[in-house]
Amino acid sequence: MTTKDEYRANRRADRRARRLKEYRHGLRPFAIAAWEISKEHNVGTLVRTAHAAAATEVILTGEREWNVPAARTADLYTEIVQLDADVAAFRAHLRHRGWSLVVVELADDSVNIFDAVYPERPCFLLGAELGGVPPELVAEAELVVQIPQWGLVPCLNLAVAGSLVVYDHLAKRHRVGGLSRPDGGLVGGRIPAFGNPDG
């Protein structure tokens, strides 16, 4: 690589680091976790949601392959942690990062998301399309929530469910003044240049 190429590469890296810092500025830390998802497009969509909502990380357990094109480069800015589908390893990661477990699951004691009061550092765990979340994680979660559904088939797409819960959390943070940029940075229908609020 030439000196000119190195200079450009360093400038790009510096710009990316600056944009990443600005991108996360003022938003509360939270994570999205997926337990053994079998449909790759769902993972890609969750990564895009995590990026749009400025999640600190996405935790994937089990399956290592996922639909990178569905993420639309959001994976460049969102940390993706891959773990084995091991309950002990997952618990250890939550403790290490200081996350409070919030399971998204249809269960008898689930709280409707409309009534949910989320903990300060939630990690929203979604279960596999077939099988759901391991029962021991449901039992020890700080909160178990479900999304109200009025249709005859009580089953939302996993990525859609994750998006709904994340944005319910952000809406509640906004109501108490927890978001520095509640408009998501949109000005006049466009995203301004980072570091220049006027675009």
Regions found by a protein language model. Give the residues of each.
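Post-transcriptional modification and biogenesis factors for structured RNAs
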Residues: 1-199
